[in-house]
Swiss-Prot record:
E.C. number: 2.7.1.5
Pathway: Carbohydrate degradation; L-rhamnose degradation; glycerone phosphate from L-rhamnose: step 2/3
Cofactor: Mg(2+)
Organism: Oceanobacillus iheyensis (strain DSM 14371 / CIP 107618 / JCM 11309 / KCTC 3954 / HTE831)
Tree of life domain: Bacteria
Record CDD domains: ASKHA_NBD_FGGY_RhaB-like
Top-level taxonomy: Bacteria, Bacillati, Bacillota, Bacilli, Bacillales
Name recorded for this polypeptide: Rhamnulokinase
Keywords: ATP-binding, Disulfide bond, Kinase, Nucleotide-binding, Rhamnose metabolism, Transferase
Catalytic center residues: D238
NCBIfam families referenced in this protein's UniProt entry, alphabetically: rhamnulo_kin
Gene: rhaB
Family statement: Belongs to the rhamnulokinase family.
Residues that, per the record, bind ATP: A12, S13, S14, G15, R16, T259, Q304, G402
One Pfam assignment: FGGY_N
Amino acid sequence: MQQCNLAVDIGASSGRVIAGYLQNGKLQLEEVHRFDNKLIDLNNYFCWDIDRIYQEILMGIKSAVDNGYQPISLGIDTWAVDFVLLDENDMRLTDAVSYRDPRTDGMMEEVFSQISKERLYLETGIQFQKFNTMYQLQALKNSNPDLIEKATSFLMIPDYLNFLLTGKKVNEYTNATTTQLVNAFTKKWDIDLIEQLGFNSNMFMDIQPPESVIGNLRPELQEELGVDFNVILPATHDTGSAVVAVPEQENSIYISSGTWSLIGVENHFPICTTKALDYNFTNEGGADYRYRFLKNIMGLWMIQEVKRNFNDEFEFADFAAMAKGESFKSIVDVDDDRFLKPENMIEEIKAYCKETNQAIPQSPSEVAKCVFNSLAVSYQQAISQIEEIYEIDFPTIYVIGGGSKNEMLNQLIADTTGKTVIAGLSEATAIGNLIVQMMAIDQIDDMQQARQIIKHSFDLYTYAKVTMEG
């Protein structure tokens, strides 16, 4: 049997289990299981079907074994900010409510009435977004204060899945930083902040960094699955894992392109300046205790919703092809909250264009071009802000993640920014997840070797600005 490491990579719309192993100095990948991840309505909240997700992970492990693999480790990454609370008997007190649920409406303002925005940013360095864990906990405190008091464990989504696999409870560093409750400098829970907000500080676990080995599978799972291996912490925030896979960090900006677009640079220190606050940048934790100085903005969620509104009549590739030959010019502000979870994305786009006295898209190609144009303009604005903060011109943009396969958007980014775009690594998150596991068990020495392996294992494609003659 082929020994492998398993990356469980769960995004906001789908999850995969990917087997990875080194062969002749190259990283080989095989997807052994895939599943949809959709929100469900529980008790009038938009929630993740966390029990089903767990069962899908077990199915993925079985599938790997059925495909001739012998797993020696497993790591889980997911989206950020969402969590569950457990009681003293380790039973769930809360459902896995999604960041897309409107329960956090008005919660930022409520928190700011207790603690200043400036203090929050100076201490945590985290971008202000209404769905951050801090505001979810504030909403929960308002609606069910007894649940927070009863809670003995706060576990983010990957932490909880790790607990189900191993029986051990830890909070992983990269995802913990997205709560806006971790001190950017000490890298520990900000207990003063937590207690000032009236949250139960005893429910937070020790924060463990990527590469930490949690432990083996629970005995009953070993018996059920017929295998045992170490569960290891990658960067459990999917973007943290994706950034590990960026081949060059010097003089380059990355765009992790998926449901969300995360645009930034990697640092060895946080930037908690007034300008960074004004531009709403974040300092999320990264692997190797690095900082991901980035802005989290709208991504391909809009086109996913457009596809759904057209009753899945078109594939994603169809929208890119239609937009390529389209001259439609209208732009929407993709970061307007109205586009987070509208009843109908197409109608919301049309309404925005009408309200701003722009041409209203009618055909599928016009809607698609409007979305892609708007994303490219949003990227350009974020990149300009990064360069202003750093007082450096970054010549290169790495586009990684699922969106890197969109050649039309890659070219649009090059044309809009005037920079060289290097795209590839559509499986960047799984790659980064696997790389960290391999470093944890000494299959790879360090990040420098890891990035050399990545360079030699995967194809990258370069896009330059097209200059119109005449």
